[in-house]
Amino acid sequence: MSIQPSTYSPDLAVPADKRVFGGRDLFSLWFSLGIGLMVLQTGALLAPGLGLSGSLLAIFLGTLVGVLLLAAVGVIGSDTGLSSMAALKLSLGSKGASLPALLNLLQLIGWGSFEIIVMRDAASLLGTRAFSEGSLWSNPVLWTLFFGTLATLLAVSGPLTFVRQILRKWGIWLLLAACLWLTWNLFAKADLADLWSRAGDGSMPFAVGFDIAIAMPLSWLPLIADYSRFGKRAKNVFGGTAVGFFIGNFWLMSLGVAYTLAFAPSGEVNALLLALAGAGLGIPLLLILLDESENAFADIHSAAVSSGILLRLKVEHLALAIGVICTLIALLAPLAQYQNFLLLIGSVFAPLFGVVLVDHFILRKRSAQVASAALRWPALLAWLGGVSTYHLLANLYPDVGATLPALVLAGLLQLVLGRAFSYGRETAQA
């Protein structure tokens, strides 16, 4: 029995009449995805070791470099009309793209589960503060099922419905209100001059802080083309993505640092959530909590699109199955090793997209027309070289930082190997 192609089928280029996202749509989407409880908690990771000034510098530089790379990869989706994992076939070959698709599926299931866990913990905390610890509203199982179901339904509906009917019309304004409220509360109640003058305890090198900050935008590299493929123009894709994500991510991660230092210096797991719950009767935290479901939606939807490369099933059906899996994991797994999880993502996907960016913009000059191949060994070897470089630097020279050197080296290897082998042979055959 043949399966009717979905609008979101990964291998089908989006036709011109379906490319409806303008710059404002993409700004709204990426501003929203740059905001979330996990972004706040990532800022909390930096606070003790780097202090306020060091953390803000690491966040600024990491986010700036990260969003430029993210927006550039978004242009690939706009140029080709393909999903993120389908576009990798142009660089790695039809079979070579299966490995990153599988890795992406696994990491997105992890991200989706983490998002549900974070939402559950925050909602349970708000329920405990508003009612009592034993009340139904503080029940973590209830909230896990609620947020898992909500994120799954959003993922099944798809980004076209979500962005244009929900996020752009009212969602972004609620987010702005929450961020402004948290910012006002910080300036009103914290001694920022004292926090600024206080140095970190040195437990985290600046380069590691940069790597953690850049990991947030880079974590979206394997997803962005799933949404930018619906963009009308490449320049709007680049601008809307870069500006939207930079503002949201820098703002919220900085608030995570400041709130941790000002109101939650104990370093306990729920200390930051308690501090946020105390601001504005918990309403800003509630609004950001609702936004977190958008991040989980993106993880589940893109996991379904990635698995569509491996399984010839309808994306909507895959989204339903993956949403159930994420919810089950959230019920059973603790929130631990988050920092290592972020760095591991950077070790695999940052070098990969160094290869992809060089291949698309320099070697193929933004063309989607390439000779078919099952495996493109030069690109695969360049990727392997980048991943090896990342782990070598991270283990032997942690003060140097690993993400950017690995990405740049992988790109340079692709430039050299691609010209010497794949593209050289294709030119010779022509």
PLM regions with names:
Residues 353-430:
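C-terminal membrane-solvent junction of multi-pass transporters and transport-like membrane proteins
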Residues 47-49, 75, 99, 121, ...:
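Membrane-water interface regions at transmembrane-helix termini and the short interhelical loops
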